Amino acid sequence: PAHMDRTQRMYERAKNHPGIVIWSLGNEAGNGINFERTYDWMKSVETTRPIQYERAEQNYNTDIYCRMYRSVEELLVYARQTEPKVYRPFIMTEYLHAMGNSGGGLKEYMDVFETEPIVQGGCIWDWVDQSFREIDADGRWYWTYGGDYGPKNVPSFGNFCCNGLVNAVREPHPHLLEVKKAYQYIKATLVDKSNLTLNIKNWYDFTNLNAYILHWQVVGDHGKVIADGTRRVDAAPHATVEVMLGAVRLPSDVREAYLNLSWTPVDAAPFINTDYEVAYDQFVLSGNKNYRTPETKLS
């Protein structure tokens, strides 16, 4: 009865809220007849929104296969399974645990999300550190957590609650920039280094890329800008277009160079100014065949 009461109260409380797009039966509580019955009840009253439960795995009482912290290899095995053929989308309820120096494997996950339609993403655990700012005896502030409160030797998971992309006052941790890069909606591939030809993919669902300005630079290994420019790109949502920037001759004192791309909005929008970078890429260009080692002058 307790499981059913909680599920029914949740549904009645939130059924008309526009922010509810998926229902969850619970978190990390095993599976069994209680969750089968609550799933059955939810399906009897809910006709449009999916219902998921992570611990159901591939049993019948979940509309989404949503196991947490699966490897890239497991995602691919699921996506390519044919006997029996899978039909439920794979959306990890948690992945990429954002504690400490984390986020380094995100690109490999994004490659799967963008190439396997049935593997549809996941939820990073989590957004913000659960900690407090305190002042020590010397007047210096520090973050507190877990066993910093309560009697000595109180049971605690230590700093395990400090696993966010931002700290407790919403200042970004370094790995938030990794997430921004991986999640950017404009992605370029350099297909011809000689003529600086790019394939540009627009991952936006509703926005044409002409809402943004492409800023490009060719920068030498000495840090100087060799060539630069801006470009407006017309690409419908989910389209891929080819853009040629043109050949750039490298000076003889440049051994190698890099192509930097940066995208900014044409018009300001809430929270985003026209100088805000929404996406970027960098490519190493071919080595300079005309490079000459600078002469060393002895004084």
Language-model-derived ranges and their functions:
Residues 248-294:
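Terminal connector regions
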